[in-house]
Design a protein with these regions (language model features):
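A domain-start/cap signature at the N-terminus of enzymes
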Residues: 1-45, 54, 99, 114, ...
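The conserved beta1-alpha1 loop
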Residues: 45, 50-52, 194
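Short, proline-enriched alpha-helix->beta-strand connector loops that line the catalytic pocket
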Residues: 110-113, 214-220, 244
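Active-site machinery of serine-nucleophile hydrolases
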Residues: 50-145
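Primarily recognizes the serine-hydrolase "nucleophile elbow" in alpha/beta-hydrolase
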Residues: 160-207, 211-214
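Short, solvent-exposed loop/turn and secondary-structure capping segments
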Residues: 42-44, 57-65, 127-132, 179, ...
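C-terminal catalytic histidine-bearing segment of alpha/beta-hydrolase fold enzymes
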Residues: 219-223, 227-284
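Gly/Ser-rich "nucleophile elbow"/oxyanion-hole loop immediately N-terminal to the catalytic nucleophile
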Residues: 37-42, 129-170
């Protein structure tokens, strides 16, 4: 841009809070970011965005606001609405080719917006639960049976399966993968960012993915980074998906496994991918 400064759209969204006194995982809360100016006629795809373990152990209130406050997701939304993106929007974790490709794509097809729903995620990586893929299933029941019905009732959300996506980072990426595959009748897209999968889990997750595909076409994306401690396990999962002929996207981008990644490429990549695939379009 001429002045070298990024444009920030301060009015990009409004917040809607959802509180639950009880449910499959006990009390819960979620914050939804709803595109501002929705006039009631336009309906938006829904993305359930899940935070990492740091927010899980800080409690329900902090967890529900993890993507909003700790990961600065609102800034990512605002910048996607006001391209071109700059290197600083990715906290420096982007190469020239990908930055150019994303900006060219945004110039051709502007970001239209999602209802991003951010619930608290229980600690499914505790010493008791980390060896069990099923530890996330009660949380998945909450999302599908309690949270999504309220989102549809109280926001301008689309309700069809193909317009529902789930994604998350680290612990949240693990949860998104397990929950999305378990409820593939409700989700059309599953994304993960630096998912906290273990080295011995690729085969079991691939088996769940094959079963999930019986519900119809499913967009799956595995994103890791060059300094992600889970990169090796995610590469194994990518190989297991390839061997099982499970269609998916696999992306390795620059960045560490920390808040800077979440606030930079993590949020941007997540939002842009779901903005496209939940409308049945190519991601870039």
């Amino acid at each position: 841009m001429a002045d070298g400064k990024a444009r920030i759209d301060e009015g990009a969204f409004t917040e809607v809070a959802f509180d639950f006194a009880a449910g499959p995982v006990g009390p819960e809360k979620a914050i939804a970011l709803v595109p501002r100016g929705a006039d009631g006629a336009e309906r938006y795809p829904v993305l359930v965005a899940l935070h990492g373990r740091g927010e899980s152990v800080r409690g329900i209130e902090a967890g529900a606001r993890g993507w909003v406050d700790d990961y600065d997701l609102g800034r990512a939304i605002s910048r996607l609405r006001s391209p071109p993106l700059m290197r600083e929007d990715f906290r420096g974790f982007v190469d020239d080719a990908r930055l150019a490709r994303i900006n060219a794509s945004l110039a051709a097809r502007p970001f239209r917006g999602l209802i991003v729903v951010c619930p608290w995620v229980p600690d499914i990586l505790s010493s008791r639960d980390r060896s069990s893929l099923d530890a996330a299933l009660p949380f998945g029941d909450f999302v599908v049976d309690h949270l999504l019905p309220r989102v549809v009732a109280e926001t301008p959300a689309r309700d069809e399966r193909t317009a529902n996506g789930i994604d998350g980072v680290s612990l949240g990426g693990r949860a998104a993968l397990i929950v999305g595959l378990a409820h593939a009748d409700r989700f059309g897209a599953i994304g993960t960012l630096q998912a906290a999968v273990q080295d011995n889990e690729a085969g079991a997750i691939a088996a769940r993915a094959r079963a999930a595909l019986a519900n119809g076409a499913l967009r799956i994306r595995l994103v890791t980074s060059d300094r992600d401690p889970f990169a090796g396990a995610i590469a194994q999962l990518h190989s297991a998906f390839d061997e099982g002929r499970i269609d998916h996207e696999y992306l390795v981008i620059p960045g560490p496994h920390d808040y800077a990644f979440n606030r930079g490429p993590g949020g941007i990549e997540m939002l842009l991918w779901h903005d496209r695939v939940l409308r049945g379009e190519p991601p870039l």
